[in-house]
Amino acid sequence: MIITIDGPSGTGKSTIAKALAKDLNFNYCNTGAMYRTLAYTYLCEPWKHLAIQELIDNPPFSFSFVSGQPLEAFLEGNLLSVELGTPEVANMASKLSQLPEVRFFMQQLQRKYAELGNCVFEGRDMGSKVFPDADVKIFLTASAEVRALRRLKDLPHNSLSKEAVYAQLIKRDETDSQRSLDPLVIPEGAVVLDSSDLTISQVLEKISALISPKLP
């Protein structure tokens, strides 16, 4: 079974997808982390001097594809974690994700991960482009104000103001929804869930109710 969870930044996609995968004992793939891994690498020496095609032709980064474990990212064998969470990396990931060669490269890796079976994929084009025939498609949304507050809590104390985070979210929304290649859209057949006034548990309950009839 393939479950896709798409939506803009700050809607709780990662938290919900990871918890859902754990509840179902499914594999979990955070595709945004895949793009951020490429972005982080591209911002580092010596790879920042390479053309992007050169970088993806011979990537120094890799991803673990192990059944029962979340996908993990490595750069020259070193596990990446907090390095992928900075605004600089997120902004670069958004720019790189607009390149056809980058999207093709990532989508091939994501489909390879799906071969493990029983996966929850979280991203922005999972249900619309990568897995249009997914068994269950969810599109998470929330108000920009709520999303800004959530993102603010994830950042180091006083690193950015609420207004700055809000502006970044609006800009990212515009970039994702207006790009010519695989824009952020509600996938055909997806169930839209507004998480603005819902707890994590409440969102999980709603998604579980959708999935239960489809489980063997």
Curated annotation (Swiss-Prot):
Q: What class of enzyme is it?
A: transferase
Query: Which UniProt keywords are listed?
Result: ATP-binding, Cytoplasm, Kinase, Nucleotide-binding, Transferase
Q: Which reaction does it catalyse?
A: CMP + ATP = CDP + ADP; dCMP + ATP = dCDP + ADP
- Any one cellular component term from GO for this entry? cytoplasm
State a single Pfam family of this protein.
Cytidylate_kin
User: Where does the record say this protein resides?
Assistant: Cytoplasm
GO MF term list: ATP binding; CMP kinase activity; dCMP kinase activity
Question: Is this entry keyworded ATP-binding?
Answer: yes
Kindly state a single biological-process term from the GO annotations of this entry.
pyrimidine nucleotide metabolic process
- EC number(s) reported in the record: 2.7.4.25
Q: What is its main location?
A: cytoplasm
Positions contributing to ATP binding: G7, P8, S9, G10, T11, G12, K13, S14, T15
The UniProt entry's sequence similarity note says:
Belongs to the cytidylate kinase family. Type 1 subfamily.
Q: What is this protein called?
A: Cytidylate kinase
| Annotated organism of origin | Chlamydia abortus (strain DSM 27085 / S26/3) (Chlamydophila abortus)
